[in-house]
Amino acid sequence: MARQVPLERCRNIGIMAHIDAGKTTTTERVLFYTGRTHRIGEVHEGTATMDWMAQEQERGITITSAATTCTWRDERINIIDTPGHVDFTAEVERSLRVLDGAVAVFDAVHGVEPQSETVWRQADKYSVPRICFINKIDKMGADFEHAIDTIRKRLNAKPVAIQYPIGLEDKFKGVIDLFKMKALVWHDEAMGSQYDVEEIPAELLKKAQAFHNLMVETIAECDDELMAKYIEGEEMTAAELQAGLRRATIAMKVFPVTVGTAFKNKGVQTLLDAVVDYLPSPLDIPPVTGKNPDTGLEEQRSADDKQPFAALAFKIMTDPFVGQLTFIRVYSGQLKTGDSVYNSSKGRTERIGRLLKMHANKREEIGEIMAGDICAVVGLKTITTGDTISDEKHPLVLESIEFPTPVISVAVEPKTKSDQEKMGVALNKLAQEDPTFRVSTDPDSGQTIIAGMGELHLEILVDRMMREFHVQANVGKPQVAYRETIRKEAQAEGKYIRQTGGSGQYGHCKIRVGPNEPGKGYEFINDIVGGTIPKEFIKPIDQGIKEALEGGVLAGYEMVDVKVTLYDGSYHDVDSNEMAFKIAGSMAFKEAARKASPVLLEPVMSVEVVVPEEYMGVIIGDLNSRRGRIEGLEHRAGSQVVKAMVPLAEMFGYVNSMRSNTQGRATFSMHFAHYEEAPRSVAEEIVAKVQGKPAAR
């Protein structure tokens, strides 16, 4: 089948921002103006097309990333609307991994907000070119120039305004196109679908000229040819400048800025024009690199239908009508319904049942997908998020998606025996969909423990378990996910010998342990020379150490950032086997870790409180009493912003305390920053609690 839309006319984009900046409202307008929907859905009414989950409609927030496809100026745009709440950071992470470009939406009053910084850093990590949309320019206190300034200062980015607003707050009626130097004015009665091109109002001419000159200079700085013309004082055409801006945007040297109000239907078409004009097609991005699992060598795949098939699974979802849906991004080649594909991450071949184009939670069946497409697949049984599927004759494993580890957990107990069976199925399905959701069993109490990124995250997962899977359960109080690590180097040996008639068991190893760089995780180094331990027993030792890491040595928490070197040992010709060396590895590690000054690590959150000036003292005092470190204060839109680092354990119930301290006039946001060593008194209390002893005073 021939390609319906040439690859250079395709865009894969995400819409990302801080919670409440207006991402979903912007997406709803995009769908309306591109003819994808015939009625505008509203978040506050619970009718937004992209927020289709019951929990999203009730809370007025986006929880999952919903995918859709629309057409603008004969260009196909695949859009993923991502959540802005920090608890759903995994949804943003996995979407950005497979997108070619993004629209970052900012609130015109606040500019850059805490979660805007988080998603911006995530986009930097995956080198995703972006354009910025300053939304809510009609809101009281809107300030276009301040919003741009926050992008420059707080994100350390180079924004370039390509539009300037005509009027602010309730006087906003259109934008100035800084390339053509014309005013675009919208009509309220036409639902924003039409605008007139007029001359720039006289009172704004000077400001528009200054912004035009700044734009020309910024674009010229990124392009040698244009710079030469600029220095010579030659006139540059709008087409030349736009081509230069496209190159600079794709190279992430600059970020074009547009402006409007999605809710009042102004500025959305010009945003769509910018998506088509400046964001990359799959042909504009570098080829993807992966490893051939057979040879271990790196290989590249470019966006070409004729190359071998390669795609990345970035999301798994359970659909009540068709079962498990796997969302994939195709990087090269093509695939038809009924074809067999090779899961190169797992080494298994599977058959494609159906291929679906998704529009939020509605499905459209298609027969074939090609390079650059994003779609859903039915029929893949063993796949997990981050797996690569490829052509079996040309296997390739692409770089997977990294997800943050959960920082908060609760115990869940089914109410009846039938709930217990249903709960197991429900939790497995939810864990398969969400890589930041973990399910485990407490070895002492036998309780089921679920862990996630925050209280809201767990609340929504429990709500889904009850509604979608009809499970009734009691939920415990939130608990903090502590970690353990070591501070010194130490050595130990593990010797496991068992003699039980016939062949026995013999495993013996000597190891050195030491701290690894924070965030580097576990590292195993094999320094065995001369065959003192045969090659086939090295992996079981590594496995035994990994299992010992899971239970720590202080309070049973996972141990992280540890380097282990295996340097000596011995074996028995008859009695040695894999199990004996696995046990020996575990014994050696536990002994070495106890000698290596083990410490408890606690998750620390980056907290930002926006508060009226008169309550600032009480907020700072409260954060200090929670073991918080004040990192900075700044003035923003008539309020003070207090930034602090606070241990997660001290933040439970903070929202109620903050509201009562400020008569409900403050707001706060927090996201996970890092793990750091817990103070001795706190660590002793936690260890004593786990071991069931009173803490030493």
Swiss-Prot record:
Gene Ontology terms for molecular function: GTP binding; GTPase activity; translation elongation factor activity
Source species, domain of life: Bacteria
InterPro entries tied to this protein: EFG_II, EFG_III, EFG_III/V, EFG_IV, EFG_V, EFG_V-like, EFTu-like_2, G_TR_CS
Subcellular location: Cytoplasm
GO BP: any one term: ribosome disassembly
Family of this protein: Belongs to the TRAFAC class translation factor GTPase superfamily. Classic translation factor GTPase family. EF-G/EF-2 subfamily.
Reported function: Catalyzes the GTP-dependent ribosomal translocation step during translation elongation. During this step, the ribosome changes from the pre-translocational (PRE) to the post-translocational (POST) state as the newly formed A-site-bound peptidyl-tRNA and P-site-bound deacylated tRNA move to the P and E sites, respectively. Catalyzes the coordinated movement of the two tRNA molecules, the mRNA and conformational changes in the ribosome.
This protein's name: Elongation factor G
Gene that specifies this protein: fusA
